[in-house]
């Protein structure tokens, strides 16, 4: 009887551990490094911290992660397309200067474009400047927008 209880307790513990998500990592990107490569290498749930600097990028985020600026880094789309395009749910963007989207009304170019299905995005404390649309949200639910300029 005791061995059965011990086995059940061990199975319950193993099942609870299997259900736990792996610990999220924090990746730090410095000016001059490839920000898109860092985002692609990140696992869902990770945080990518972007240090102060100028990044010429049309960033695509297709997994749940946090992109956090450290010291207000500037992400410039180079006046082509979207500066940041979010296609996954549960993405957090905070502390960034996002600028220089493209100018196509047909394509709805934006500094930050939240695509259909990118539910529960959080856009917090960013400066959106020199963009056709600072922030464009299309068919995404429960998006939080706080303290942006």
Predicted regions and their residues:
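Bacterial N-terminal signal peptides
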Residues: 7-17
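Extracellular beta-strand repeat scaffolds in secreted/surface proteins
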Residues: 46-50
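Positively charged n-region of N-terminal signal peptides that target proteins for export
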Residues: 1-4
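Extracellular beta-strand-rich solenoid/capping regions of secreted or surface-exposed proteins
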Residues: 36, 40, 44, 54-68, ...
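Right-handed parallel beta-helix/beta-solenoid
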Residues: 15-41, 66
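Solenoidal tandem-repeat scaffolds enriched in leucines and small polar residues
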Residues: 130, 135-149
